[in-house]
C-alpha cells in the first residue's frame, strides 16, 4: 500500500497540472491529507461513489500519462545513478587523500552531483 501511495504522490507531483482542479484537489485530499472517500464527499456535498469516481478517473489518467511517457520511471532511475556516481566521486576523493589534481577533480564532481540531486 505504501509503495502505491508513494507512486501516486509522485505521479501527482509530476503530472498534477494536467488534471482538472477538482481532480487535483480530490487526489490531494485522498493521498496526501489521508481523508476518506466519505469525508471528501461530505466536504463537497456529493456521494461517496461520486468522490470515488473522480479519484479513480484521475488516477487512471495519471497512470496512463506515465505509461506513455515513462517520465517518473526515468527520473527514479536517474536519481539512483546520481547517488551511485556521488558515492564513486566521494570514494575517489577519499583515495586521493584530499591532495592534488585528482582530489580537486573529485571535489568538483561531488559538487556538480550535489547540484543535480537537488534539481
Task: Identify the function of each model-found stretch.
Residues 10-19:
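Short amphipathic alpha-helical boundary/capping segments
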Residues 21-32:
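Short amphipathic alpha helix immediately N-terminal
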Residues 26, 39-41, 51:
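Hydrophobic positions on the alpha-helical face of helix-turn-helix-like DNA-binding modules
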Residues 47-48:
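Helix-turn-helix DNA-binding motif, specifically the short coil turn and the N-cap/start of the second
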Residues 54-57:
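Residues within the DNA-recognition helix of helix-turn-helix
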Residues 59-66:
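C-terminal flanking helix
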Residues 69-96:
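Intrinsically disordered, low-complexity basic tails/linkers immediately adjacent to helix-turn-helix/homeobox/MYB/SANT
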Amino acid at each position: 500500500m505504501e509503495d502505491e501511495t508513494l507512486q501516486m504522490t509522485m505521479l501527482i507531483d509530476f503530472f498534477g497540472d494536467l488534471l482538472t482542479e477538482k481532480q487535483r484537489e480530490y487526489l490531494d485530499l485522498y493521498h496526501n491529507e489521508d481523508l476518506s472517500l466519505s469525508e471528501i464527499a461530505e466536504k463537497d456535498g456529493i456521494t461517496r461513489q461520486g468522490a470515488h469516481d473522480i479519484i479513480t478517473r484521475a488516477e487512471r489518467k495519471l497512470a496512463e500519462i506515465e505509461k506513455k511517457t515513462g517520465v517518473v520511471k526515468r527520473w527514479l532511475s536517474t536519481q539512483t545513478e546520481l547517488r551511485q556516481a556521488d558515492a564513486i566521486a566521494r570514494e575517489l576523493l577519499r583515495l586521493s587523500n584530499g591532495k592534488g589534481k585528482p582530489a580537486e577533480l573529485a571535489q568538483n564532481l561531488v559538487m556538480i552531483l550535489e547540484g543535480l540531486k537537488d534539481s
